[in-house]
Amino acid sequence: MYGLLMALAMLFMAGLCACSAQSSAAETAPQTIVVGIDVFDPYSYLDRNGQFAGIDVGLATEAFSRLGYTPEFRTISWPDKDNLLSDGTINCIWSCFSMNGRETKYQWAGPYMYSRQVVAVRADSDIQSLSDLAGKRIGVQATTKAESLFLGEISSLLPEVKQVNSFETTEDMFAALRKGYVDAVAGHEALVAKLTNLDESSYRVLAESPYSSELGVAFAKDTHEDLAVQLTQTLEDMKQDGTIGRVAEKFGLDAEKTVWGEQGK
């Protein structure tokens, strides 16, 4: 009888230990957070193996890992982003999303870097600064921030140019620059860098940026307040320890200006 009681006691204790181990594992397992992204190379895109890649994908993976989360990336229809946030289909938007003008619309984490518009010219051009663009022919990609800037739809200190030529693709835009149909081209730094890096001896990017905006991670307004604060601090840590700069540089961006802005650190 005593032996039977001992055996039952041991089985009971083993069961308690197993439950405790399972509970502990559940508590330490990373939580999943659903991140909505747009396809915008080099910030967020699918690589040749069909895996999510890019600046924001790398930063989100690292930042959430430091906080004990595993990000689940989900491509979204950009016009539907607010509805997807509000109904909980996604937990946040992390996809080269500008905070400027939207400061009170979302619960933000960040800013974590700057998104810059830049101007590129031919290597032998006499254009050295933005002021030299006065009276020049400018090439831009249609429906982009650069087009709005040079058409005067966004306030800036740009001089009055002679002509704004809008092209369907950045490749067409650079072809026009190469052939001399335009004097300069403007666009997002990442897209311009991708093409100028293919032939560095033929092009030059002006040091001045005509426009920059702060990028952040957007949660639905009045939600995830604690997580947004924690993520903001983690992103600041990643700026300070050089993580964000290294990722930006890997994709051809000016690490100093991308992380710290035009004035630098």
Feature annotation, model-predicted:
Residues 80-83, 96-105, 149-152, 176-178, ...:
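A ligand-binding cleft/hinge motif common to bilobed small-molecule-binding domains
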Residues 57-66, 127, 131-137, 142-145, ...:
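Extended ligand-binding regions for polar small-molecule ligands
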Residues 61, 70-132, 204-209:
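Acidic, polar ligand-binding/catalytic clefts
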Residues 39-40, 48-51, 97-99, 122-126, ...:
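Short coil/turn segments
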Residues 26-96, 166, 230, 241, ...:
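Extracytoplasmic small-molecule ligand-binding "clamshell" domains
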Residues 46, 60-69, 146-167, 196-200, ...:
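Ligand-binding cleft/hinge of the Venus flytrap
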Residues 37-39, 114-121, 193, 197-236, ...:
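Periplasmic-binding protein-like
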Residues 15-18:
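C-terminal motif of bacterial Sec signal peptides marking the signal peptidase cleavage site
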